[in-house]
Amino acid sequence: MSLENFGNFLTLDEKHSFIKKYFKEFYTKDFKLFASKDKHYRTRAELSFYHENDTLFYAMFDPKNKKKYIIKYLDFADEKICTFMPKLLEYLRQDNKLKEKLFGVEFLTTKQELSVTLLYHKNIEDIKSNLENLSNILHINLIARSKGKKLIFKTENLRQTLNIQGRKIFYEFNNDCFIQPNTTINEKMITWVCEILNTQKRMDLLELYCGYGNFTLALAPFFFKVLATEISKSNINFALKNCELNNTTNIHFARLSSEELSLAIKKEREFFRLKDIRLDDFNFSHVLVDPPRAGLDKSVIDLIKKYENIIYISCNPITLKENLKELSLTHRVEEFALFDQFVNTPHLECGVFLSKV
């Protein structure tokens, strides 16, 4: 979440100064700061197209007036995206069928791979052969979308490898998954959690909002058992696949919302999706939450504050502060980290470790 409502904070030092004051009622020790490289740090980019005089340009929307402006280069985007952008544009300009009613493009990269999604205001079945030629000639994983339709050429799944404390963690996901869009910062974030766990007495882990297992796979070796929940069926399927890729056998996934899990743990409701999982077999010493911008609702806070240790990854300092007002009644902030996920913007990712008072 942007800090622009509080001031024009762009550098990590400026963000740090603001956060230090903003959270002073909860934390007065030193913050850990994790910087990103200044350029080519972002693995996802979404662009519009501008059509003029029968040719095509990449474009973005000005957030102030909502008007399109032409762009030629994205210095924040991964090098693979920057290298491929002119190749794709040149190809599209030469194919009238591909160019017609094309309104957007999404790029997604990992350390190894790149996928491209083209967005159309027309029936993409009519240009299927053109799209296939594009994929083959430019050697690219291609997805095309229009209303109610989706075509995939080669594959929509990407492989990723993260280096965490000398270990390689393998992942597979696609463009529909929520991903941390700065791989370097993602590795630093996971490593920060691992370094904290190295000093802890650990039993089992409860993780909410696990996605495709970004944190789950890296943290599993620290615990006897892990229960990870996620509402997206496709994310759960990727998480199960990622367990296979890493030969990990101590993670149990449940397709439940955090509110449903709360009801199940309190034995207020039974869920068929938990038929193979005995909640009473878990002894949670730690809980990890990585919620959306809205933060945690009261039912989730009431659930997690029962546990000894809480790791809270936040993309919104505003809702984080609101949640800490509740959590600080039972827990104390022991560590606070700032991750400069989006360089030279007012956005900031926070990591907080709390232990029971």
UniProtKB/Swiss-Prot annotation:
The cross-references to SUPFAM superfamilies, in alphabetical order and at most eight, read:
S-adenosyl-L-methionine-dependent methyltransferases
Q: Which Gene3D superfamilies match?
A: 2.40.50.1070, Vaccinia Virus protein VP39 (3.40.50.150)
Which reactions appear under catalytic activity for this entry?
Answer: uridine(54) in tRNA + S-adenosyl-L-methionine = 5-methyluridine(54) in tRNA + S-adenosyl-L-homocysteine + H(+); uridine(341) in tmRNA + S-adenosyl-L-methionine = 5-methyluridine(341) in tmRNA + S-adenosyl-L-homocysteine + H(+)
Asked if the record carries the keyword Transferase, the reply is yes
In this protein, the active site sits at C315 (nucleophile), E349 (proton acceptor)
Which of the seven top EC classes does this enzyme belong to? transferase
EC numbers for this chain = 2.1.1.-, 2.1.1.35
Key words, A-Z: Methyltransferase, S-adenosyl-L-methionine, Transferase, tRNA processing
Q: Which InterPro entries match?
A: MeTrfase_TrmA_AS, SAM-dependent_MTases_sf, TrmA_MeTrfase, U5_MeTrfase_fam
The terms describing its cellular component in GO are:
cytosol
* GO MF annotation: an example: rRNA binding
Q: Which is a GO BP term held by this UniProt record? A: methylation
Give the binding site residues for S-adenosyl-L-methionine: Q180, Y209, N214, E230, D290
Q: Does the keyword Methyltransferase apply?
A: yes
Q: Which family does it belong to?
A: Belongs to the class I-like SAM-binding methyltransferase superfamily. RNA M5U methyltransferase family. TrmA subfamily.
Q: What HAMAP family does the record point to?
A: RNA_methyltr_TrmA
Its biological function?
A: Dual-specificity methyltransferase that catalyzes the formation of 5-methyluridine at position 54 (m5U54) in all tRNAs, and that of position 341 (m5U341) in tmRNA (transfer-mRNA).
Q: What is this protein called?
A: tRNA/tmRNA (uracil-C(5))-methyltransferase
